[in-house]
Regions:
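Rossmann-like adenosine-cofactor binding region
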Residues: 56-62, 178-273
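NAD(P)-dependent dehydrogenase/reductase Rossmann-like domain
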Residues: 296-321
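Short, Asp-centered acidic motifs that coordinate Mg2+ and/or phosphate
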Residues: 48-49, 70, 203, 231, ...
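Glycine-rich Rossmann-fold phosphate-binding loop(s) that bind the pyrophosphate
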Residues: 153-154
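NAD(P)-binding Rossmann-fold cofactor-contacting core
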Residues: 166-184
């Protein structure tokens, strides 16, 4: 009887990650792209560990998984996993804490400048042969000296603050779980009252998990208090912004624009109003999709599994359940 640990890789990870485990003497590895509940339930019942990308892992997939000890998430969000059931079964959840912070921060920079400088409109104007109409085009927005609010101050938030201070912006941070001193050490200013803070912000970028407390946190009541020149960017989780409320606020010119990388439902339904709103820059949950980042994430996802069974996984990578 083999003493090897059985590992299920749910959805492909970068080949550099697979190289760490495919020929490892302590593991038998199986890959699956079938993310149906029936398949995952069947596959997991004999597994000791698994990795997961964005597929859902509801509690019923853990039924019968008597040996399952670790699920390594390819990313930092974990709202696709039934945490309550994982806790009941003493299954640890690990995240790729170090892989994507810089990449997502760069994406936010790109999206902000794209929206502020009306990149798509200006590009289309030239391509359509309307260069001569340049003086009729709407003006753009500078980011210099503007107020930038980071909502959530984990690794991505810390990567952001370095970059936006380089733009000479005034950086504020909303995170009830981070001490004021930690924020000020990096050049930011902590805000305690979110409802009051958003009234004076020019840019708001979301980097917090989706929880009962953060779901629909950005809603019409909050949006209507923002500056008409405000740009809001979400590269965290879709449910944090109420999508219909955002569409309404944009149509009423309550804010300048939005950058959306994540949706409440992925892929979004065809009738999602944001898909037809030209004031929104959209991307398909690809803020971390650089080759460099995907390599790091693939390697860290697999290394977390190996480190767990070798009892050397960093505690900071394990989700508190």
């Amino acid at each position: 009887m083999s003493n090897k640990k059985k590992i299920l890789i749910i959805q492909k990870v970068h080949e550099k990650g697979m190289e760490l485990i495919n020929n490892h003497p302590n593991y038998d590895v199986e890959e699956t792209d079938d993310t149906s509940i029936e398949n995952l339930k069947s596959k997991l019942k004999d597994c000791d560990g698994a990795s997961i990308r964005i597929a859902k892992l509801p509690g019923e997939t853990f039924e019968g998984a008597k040996n399952l000890k670790i699920i390594s998430r390819h990313g930092v969000g974990y709202d696709n996993i039934d945490l309550k059931k994982a806790k009941e079964k003493d299954i640890k959840i690990a995240i790729t804490a170090n892989a994507n912070a810089v990449t997502v921060a760069e994406h936010v920079m790109f999206v902000l400048l794209n929206i502020a400088k009306r990149k798509d409109l200006f590009d289309k104007t030239v391509r359509d042969g309307n260069f001569k109409d340049r003086n009729k085009l709407p003006k753009t927005i500078e980011v210099w000296k503007k107020n930038f609010l980071i909502m959530g101050f984990g690794r991505i938030g810390k990567a952001l603050i370095k970059r936006f201070l380089g733009f000479e912006m005034n950086v504020f941070v909303y995170d009830p779980f981070v001490d004021k001193d930690k924020i000020e050490e990096l050049g930011g200013r902590k805000v305690e009252d979110l409802a009051e803070a958003v009234k004076t912000m020019d840019v708001i970028s979301l980097h917090m998990p989706l929880t009962d407390q953060t779901e629909n946190l950005i809603n019409y009541d909050l949006l209507k208090t923002m500056k008409k020149t405000c740009i809001i960017i979400n590269a965290a989780r879709g449910g944090i912004i109420h999508e219909e409320d955002l569409d309404k606020a944009l149509n009423e010119n309550l804010i300048f624009g939005a950058g959306i990388d994540v949706f409440k439902k992925e892929p979004p339904d065809d009738n999602n109003p944001l898909l037809k709103n030209e004031k929104v820059y959209l991307s398909p949950h690809t803020a971390a999709f650089t080759d460099e980042c995907m390599t790091r994430m693939g390697k860290e996802t697999i290394q977390n599994i190996i480190d767990f069974f070798e009892e050397k996984l960093e505690k900071s990578k394990i989700v508190k359940l």
